[in-house]
Curated annotation (Swiss-Prot):
Family statement drawn from the similarity comment of this UniProt entry: Belongs to the lyase 1 family. Argininosuccinate lyase subfamily.
Organism, as annotated: Proteus mirabilis (strain HI4320)
Pathway in which the depicted protein is active: Amino-acid biosynthesis; L-arginine biosynthesis; L-arginine from L-ornithine and carbamoyl phosphate: step 3/3
EC number(s) from the headed UniProt entry: 4.3.2.1
Protein name: Argininosuccinate lyase
HAMAP family hit by this protein: Arg_succ_lyase
UniProt catalytic activity: 2-(N(omega)-L-arginino)succinate = fumarate + L-arginine
Cellular component GO terms, alphabetical: cytosol
Gene Ontology molecular function: any one: argininosuccinate lyase activity
Chief localisation class: cytoplasm
Keywords: Amino-acid biosynthesis, Arginine biosynthesis, Cytoplasm, Lyase
Signal peptide limits: none
Length: 460
């Protein structure tokens, strides 16, 4: 039975009912709805609507219902209830009779669903933060194992300067740290309870909403009932964090797809996260990474859709807000799945160090070192830059690396160049000179790994 039938003389058209009902997706809020109902029953005792015995009966029945949901959550979908609130109430009435009809006193589905969704978001934020931390740990472990794996760094997808695979791993660890901090920051605004705001004007019962918020595990109660039932900023913030996080994972995937390609050959992915071709028996495809990259778009789409849903809504609640859940659920599930899959990809990944080093020596990635060498000899940088550009052109024409050019050839471009230049042009020298904080030198990378392990409590 619908919760609102008294006003109507005709039954809803079945087509409208199917269009209107939300149980097919908001069943995921069952535990939150039950938890909120337990807290609300306690609040009703404080204003004399329920006796202590009645509240105890309701709480016991709600906990029994919670256990049933835990055992078989999909059984909810067998019901023709309009939404999860209707389902919980009908099940409660079936257990305790007319007493169950008293629970909704002073409460609206508007503040109820807002509370349920915030509780769900809080739980998911905790899960996502942990998944991010686990991926960060995997990156740090991979970095520690590959501190000496020299590879080319890229700009414009052109070889630029030598870096290490460890330095690459730590770059993504930093991105993930920002993702985790965004979730932590969003939690400060999410952690307020709307329950007790009624449909829009507040509840008519003198309920202590701050106490109610504490029972629910929120830091405090909201300040304005109109805002409470119509606020979905927390959905936007979580979707925004997910969208940014998925961009980072997509870039991570794209890098590894390239590193794994036959053209680069820097890494070998585990068989556990790759698949083959139905036609070409030699293929080993990076499907896990390609799916991470591909799933990024659906999360961006969920954020855009929610923005568009909310942009024209007047205060307070509107049925449009029912559209907040499907995109959110899918985006959070997708982000979580991709975080776990990225962690799995790193487990078993092998770095082909000889091939990485060979590639790092190509493409004149040490040209900047020659320019810096000339600067140290007193040549202004802009002039040194021009000189080295000419040296590179000459080397390309001869099919040689810079360090393969004879000293006499180098001195044609600048008399400042002497024999020690060959030591400067070595890969190790290129790395060792990057001693400033955040640089790619062994000293800085080792320090960064140590600090990351402290931050992530990896030494405990």
């Amino acid at each position: 039975m619908a919760l609102w039938g008294g006003r109507f003389s005709q039954q809803a058209d079945q087509r409208f009912k199917q269009f209107n009902d939300s149980l097919r997706f908001d069943y995921r809020l069952a535990q939150q709805d039950i938890f909120g109902s337990v807290a609300w029953s306690k609040a009703l005792v404080t204003v004399g609507v329920l006796s202590q015995d009645e509240q105890a009966q309701l709480e016991q029945a709600l906990y029994e219902l919670s256990e049933e949901v835990t055992a078989n959550p999909h059984s909810i979908l067998q019901s023709d209830a309009e939404d999860i609130h209707s389902w919980v109430e009908s099940k409660l009435i079936a257990k305790v009779g007319d007493l169950g009809k008293k629970l909704h006193t002073g409460r609206s589905r508007n503040d109820q669903v807002a509370t349920d969704l915030k509780l769900w978001c809080k739980e998911e934020v905790a899960h996502l933060r942990q998944a991010i931390i686990e991926l960060q740990k995997a990156l740090v472990v991979t970095a520690e194992q590959n501190q000496h794996a020299v590879m080319p760094g890229y700009t414009h997808l052109q070889r630029a300067q030598p870096v290490t695979f460890a330095h690459w791993c730590l770059a993504y660890k930093e991105m993930l740290a920002r993702d985790e901090s965004r979730l932590a920051d969003a939690l400060t605004r999410l952690d307020v309870s709307p329950l007790g705001s009624g449909a829009l004007a507040g509840t008519a019962y003198d309920i202590d909403r701050e106490q109610l918020a504490q029972w629910l595990g929120f830091a405090s109660a909201t300040n304005n009932s109109l805002d409470s039932v119509s606020d979905r900023d927390h959905v936007l913030e979580l979707l925004s964090a997910a969208a940014i996080g998925m961009v980072h994972l997509s870039r991570f995937a794209e890098d590894l797809i390239f590193f794994n390609s036959g053209e680069a050959g820097f890494i070998e992915l585990s068989d556990k996260v790759t698949s083959g071709s139905s036609l070409m028996p030699q293929k080993k495809n990076p499907d896990a990474l390609e799916l991470i990259r591909g799933k990024c778009g659906r999360v961006q789409g969920a954020l855009t859709a929610m923005m568009m849903t909310l942009k024209g809504l007047p205060l307070a609640y509107n049925k449009d807000m029912q559209e907040d859940k499907e995109g959110l659920f899918d985006a959070v599930d997708t982000w979580s799945d991709c975080l776990h899959m990225a962690t799995l990809v790193l487990d078993g990944l092998q770095v082909r160090r000889p091939r990485c080093e060979e590639a790092a020596k190509q493409g004149y990635a040490n040209a900047t070192e020659l320019a810096d060498y000339l600067v140290a000899k007193g040549v202004p940088f802009r002039q040194a830059h021009h000189i080295v550009g000419e040296v590179v052109v000459s080397a390309i024409e001869q099919g040689k690396a810079l360090e393969e050019l004879a000293l006499s050839e180098l001195q044609k471009f600048s008399s400042k160049i002497t024999v020690e230049v060959y030591e400067i042009l070595s890969l190790q020298s290129c790395l060792d000179k990057r001693l400033a904080k955040g640089g790619v030198s062994q000293q800085q990378v080792s320090y960064a790994i140590t600090e990351a392990k402290k931050q992530l409590n990896m030494d405990e």
